[in-house]
């Protein structure tokens, strides 16, 4: 996807949820620069990060509920009766999530959108704030992956 098309998609999405006037240039630029698939560990993603998208949290829908259609982070839908993704679907999810990650950056959208503002998150994410602290175990797992660690 050309960089200008990714920026246009990010702006259109922000406008759709009523935040176009406040979308920062940094967020638009981040949308235009997808991470390289060679920089973040696929196996860590598949085994540790991807299950987070299926986890039910009190007061919130599972990430997959909204992120399987109509959002910039588009995960593969799970067929009825299945509770995990197959290898092909996991690779597609990995590629989709790379679009919201800048390897080594704590400002990656994957980290800041679902994090409470008072914990360092931003005001985006119409699905609510899933983590109130950067000390949350799930958020720490996401951070570990984004920072390039495999532990």
Provide a role label for each language-model segment.
Residues 1-4:
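Positively charged n-region of N-terminal signal peptides that target proteins for export
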Residues 6-16:
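Bacterial N-terminal signal peptides
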Residues 15-151:
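Aromatic- and Gly/Pro-enriched helix-to-coil junctions and flexible linker segments
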């Amino acid at each position: 996807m050309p960089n200008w098309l990714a920026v246009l998609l990010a702006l259109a999405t922000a406008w759709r949820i009523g935040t176009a006037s406040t979308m920062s240039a940094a967020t638009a630029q981040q949308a235009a620069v997808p991470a390289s698939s060679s920089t973040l560990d696929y196996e860590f993603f598949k085994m540790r990060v991807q299950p987070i998208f299926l986890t039910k949290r009190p007061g919130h829908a599972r990430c997959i509920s909204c992120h399987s259609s109509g959002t910039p982070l588009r995960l593969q839908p799970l067929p009825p009766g299945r509770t995990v993704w197959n290898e092909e679907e996991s690779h597609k999810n990995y590629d989709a999530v790379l679009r919201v990650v800048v390897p080594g950056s704590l400002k990656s959208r994957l980290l800041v959108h679902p994090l409470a503002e008072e914990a360092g998150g931003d005001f985006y994410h119409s699905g609510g704030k899933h983590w109130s602290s950067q000390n949350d175990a799930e958020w720490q797992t996401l951070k570990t992956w984004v920072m390039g660690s495999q532990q």
